[in-house]
């Protein structure tokens, strides 16, 4: 099983290199870089420059806020810089964020994402063939690439894979049919939801003519500590995050499948009334315990096996907040790899 490190999206840029070296030394295979308050390609560059074996994947970069050519060039440069340790993870975000936070168009997201991935692949092919490989459809027209703008060759370095972050069945199907891997969202990483809603879609896409199944990395929220006081604080932090996430209609399917269909509306009502100070208290412990992987170090490998063994190909975990526990966490990583 691929063990993927998460990262605090608000981490100071000058702390990224040390953090990347830390997770590499603990035995993590990959570092996922989100796009929230920093450019994910800048953070990826810092992490890759500081390490020698750690793989880095944007998890995820927002596709619709930038041209596919820009994403392709960034991914190409990072692959070259790292000798093939970078992969491009893409996601859509929700309409309101794309249109109102970024001021970019958002329509037909599944079709647009399909076009985007194909356009990025066309760019990669252009860089390899040293000439323009045109790509044109309803969304993008890439028909010009002069020699002066060709990036340098990367030789035998592996071309970046393209992974997709997906929540709904149509985007999941697109990932299975077109991309190199799938990254789940914290709201759809529950093992029951994966088993009943995600994996069957992937298998169906494979049976529809795709040559092989794609790897799936689950990205659950986690609370992993031996300290009761730290556990209490982490639980409250994660409940606040869940209250924010589950107020978004697009993230409701897990709530429905677990029997909490009314919770999303309740959270949205509190937002509309500007009553969010203690909205995390709306998250019941029964739901929290199902969707958040909570464990001590000793039990972590067992919990991962119980929830995700045989179901997914990788899992994201956040390293300890206290670096004194790094050795114990590294032992957890070794144990997970041995039993999965």
Q: PLM features: residue spans?
A:
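C-terminal amphipathic alpha-helical "assembly" element
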Residues: 1-28, 79, 87, 121, ...
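N-terminal beta1-alpha1-beta2 module of alpha/beta enzyme domains
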Residues: 1-58, 64, 159-160
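Active-site mouth loops of central-metabolism enzymes
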Residues: 2-14, 61-68, 156-167, 222-225, ...
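Glycine-enriched alpha-helix->loop->beta-strand junction motifs that scaffold or abut catalytic
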Residues: 27-29, 50-54, 82, 174-183, ...
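Alpha-helix-loop-beta-strand connector modules within alpha/beta enzyme cores
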Residues: 43-61, 65, 116, 203-205, ...
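Catalytic cores of alpha/beta
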Residues: 68-76, 225-235
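Internal, glycine-rich beta/alpha segment that forms the wall or movable "lid"
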Residues: 75, 80-86, 90-181, 185-214, ...
């Amino acid at each position: 099983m691929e063990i993927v490190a998460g990262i605090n999206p608000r981490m100071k840029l000058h702390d990224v290199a040390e953090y990347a070296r830390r997770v590499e030394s603990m035995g993590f295979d990959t570092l996922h870089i989100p796009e929230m308050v920093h450019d994910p390609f800048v953070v990826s560059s810092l992490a890759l420059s500081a390490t020698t074996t750690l793989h880095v994947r944007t998890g995820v970069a927002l596709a619709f806020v930038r041209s596919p050519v820009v994403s392709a060039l960034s991914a190409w440069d990072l692959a070259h810089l790292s000798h093939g340790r970078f992969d491009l993870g893409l996601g859509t975000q929700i309409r309101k964020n794309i249109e109102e936070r970024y001021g970019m168009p958002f329509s037909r997201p599944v079709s647009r994402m399909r076009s985007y991935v194909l356009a990025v692949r066309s760019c990669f092919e252009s860089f390899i063939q040293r000439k323009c490989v045109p790509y044109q459809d309803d969304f993008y027209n890439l028909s010009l690439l002069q020699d002066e703008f060709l990036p340098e060759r990367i030789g035998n370095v592996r071309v970046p894979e393209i992974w997709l972050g997906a929540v709904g069945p149509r985007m999941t199907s697109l990932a299975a049919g077109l991309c190199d891997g799938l990254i789940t969202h914290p709201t759809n990483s529950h093992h029951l939801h994966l088993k009943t809603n995600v994996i069957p879609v992937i298998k169906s896409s494979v049976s529809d003519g795709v040559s092989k199944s794609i790897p799936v990395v689950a990205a659950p929220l986690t609370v992993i500590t031996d300290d009761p006081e730290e556990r209490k604080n982490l639980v409250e932090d994660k409940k606040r995050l869940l209250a924010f996430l589950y107020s978004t209609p697009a993230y409701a399917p897990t709530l429905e499948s677990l029997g909490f269909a009314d919770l999303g509306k309740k959270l949205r009502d509190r937002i509309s009334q500007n009553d969010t100070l203690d909205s995390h208290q709306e998250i019941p412990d029964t739901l929290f315990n199902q969707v958040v992987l909570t464990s001590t170090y000793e039990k972590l490998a067992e919990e991962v096996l119980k929830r995700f063994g045989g179901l997914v190909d990788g899992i994201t975990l956040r390293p300890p907040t206290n670096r004194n526990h790094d050795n114990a966490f590294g032992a957890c990583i070794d144990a997970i790899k041995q039993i999965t």
